[in-house]
């Protein structure tokens, strides 16, 4: 019952969210795109799963410009898209926000080149200071975009039930952003991170009980996620609680964690009825 209350409270927060500039900068560094080469029309966009439609509307209200539209991709999947073409809004709102709050080297380089190509008044934007402390709100926005909360279940002979359960917090970035991930791990998570690599991607992972219980859980309890990822976190906390109580070493505890993983999948794709109607309308055009 307490978990359901938390999930419903999280839904209400998303629909009445107060966007902070540092959060938005972190979210843009994870999910934003700067379009248009020199000589082309510049524009900026963010796209998200339709479940985050209300949050995207809050972003459009923050910039006091434009509307969020639903788009259906060639593969049939729908997404909520917010695009800014207005050069005035780009120059007077997007550029100041990003130049003052960006942290990521890769996105900052893209943003810098895009700005130099289209806006004569912004020819000397400095790259972020690698020694500057990261704002917690920036990290929340970045994790709302590129972070993950999940559990791993491995077959093993080391446990009586035949399975080992691990809860994981993960942020994935290109190889070139390992320095940024190290800064995040050292500043916020007590240097408890481990590393994993897949193709050209680095994964900062917190898997130790110390790191999860003493750093990750309290940080995101205090600094709320704004996307549907908050549901992932709340359900992940229940998995972590099961492990803290050593219930995961029993078959009933293992089943509980599997049920919580299924709930995560449900809440990731659960869309309010009004948004579903808009998607259906799009698909039936």
Each PLM stretch: what is its role?
Residues 1-285:
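Internal intein/HINT superfamily modules and their associated LAGLIDADG
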